């Protein structure tokens, strides 16, 4: 009924949760809803965290754009940007990550890359592995999962976590990660 859940996991001994919320990628983001030409109800879950060591704060937005609707992906990115400005302001450090169901060179990212940078492209250490595996049925070159950031963050590492975790595939996507400093 409500659609998918975009979980955000964090180390509670390292970070303090200051605020959190969810919105739907649709024309009515505050209501359970399916947007534009989307096949599914899609959401964004966000958190505001405070680093217990440094006292610095940042925002993280986790999303999953629609896999079928092109307009849903395009409008979803625009809404995501609007909500980041509304929730985090225009300057606070922020990270956006998730399954965008869109290759990195797609024009869908143009509005996002006007004020955020790709962790994969800017990290001091990165990889060029595919992120979608289709439970073994897809070529290992498809990259549709992304991390973007803005503000006073420095990205040291971007990694596609394609190791064996006790099963050949834990999902149809490999997890992605970034290591950063505030």
Residue ranges and their predicted role:
Residues 6-8, 44-48, 62, 146-147, ...:
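Conserved hydrophobic/aromatic beta-strand scaffold that supports enzyme active sites
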Residues 1, 68, 101:
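Glycine-/small-residue-rich active-site loops that bind phosphorylated ligands and cofactors
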Residues 1-57, 160-161:
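Structured beta-strand-rich core segments of catalytic domains in phosphoester-bond hydrolases
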């Amino acid at each position: 009924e409500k659609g998918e859940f975009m979980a955000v996991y964090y180390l509670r001994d390292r970070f303090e949760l200051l605020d959190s919320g969810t919105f739907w990628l649709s024309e009515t983001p505050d209501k359970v809803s399916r947007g534009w030409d989307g096949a599914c109800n899609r959401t964004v879950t966000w958190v505001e965290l405070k680093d217990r060591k440094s006292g610095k704060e940042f925002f993280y937005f986790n999303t999953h754009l629609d896999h079928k609707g092109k307009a849903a992906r395009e409008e979803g990115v625009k809404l995501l940007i609007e909500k980041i400005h509304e929730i985090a302001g225009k300057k606070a450090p922020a990270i956006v990550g998730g399954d965008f169901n869109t290759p990195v060179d797609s024009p869908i990212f143009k509005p996002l890359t006007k004020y955020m940078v790709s962790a994969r492209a800017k990290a001091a250490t990165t990889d060029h592995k595919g992120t979608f595996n289709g439970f073994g049925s897809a070529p290992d070159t498809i990259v549709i999962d992304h991390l973007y950031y803005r503000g006073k963050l420095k990205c040291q590492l971007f990694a596609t976590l394609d190791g064996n975790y006790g099963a050949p595939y834990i999902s149809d996507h490999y997890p992605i990660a970034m290591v950063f400093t505030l």
